[in-house]
């Protein structure tokens, strides 16, 4: 593994352990050339996925991009990082087990929204605001009003 700090190709594994509920291996590495320490994760990839964007453009599925978008939506929310890691791994496993290699971005967005709705409403709304391209406060009002159960009062 190449050192991200100095580019040396001879790094050493100092510690390996299961991560993300035993679906990944976490490795702590050390670079003898510069003394840098870094962590890598090794995961099973069942199949290479391709995302079909709404424009029709195709791009390779990027787990890191998915993780970044979810972590941005969940920033400063009271959810354990391990729980997010498990959720992200579950989303990826679900995508890989769909039987298709080409997956529309809309499908990925809906799966992410389902998962976020189960763990944190605020993160769910934040993600939806980007995914559904909210343009005004009214978009938020409409979306949030659909989340609330009816009060039984006539307006």
Curated annotation (Swiss-Prot):
A GO MF term: DNA binding
Stretches annotated zinc finger (unnamed): 3-34
Cofactor requirements of the protein: Zn(2+)
Record text on cofactor binding: Binds 1 zinc ion.
Membrane-spanning parts: none
Pfam families named in the record: ATP-cone, Zn_ribbon_NrdR
Keywords, ordered alphabetically: ATP-binding, DNA-binding, Metal-binding, Nucleotide-binding, Repressor, Transcription, Transcription regulation, Zinc, Zinc-finger
InterPro entries xrefs: ATP-cone_dom, NrdR-like_N, RNR_NrdR-like
Entry-linked PANTHER family: TRANSCRIPTIONAL REPRESSOR NRDR
Role this protein plays: Negatively regulates transcription of bacterial ribonucleotide reductase nrd genes and operons by binding to NrdR-boxes.
Name the record gives this protein: Transcriptional repressor NrdR
Organism: Dinoroseobacter shibae (strain DSM 16493 / NCIMB 14021 / DFL 12)
UniProt lineage: Bacteria, Pseudomonadati, Pseudomonadota, Alphaproteobacteria, Rhodobacterales
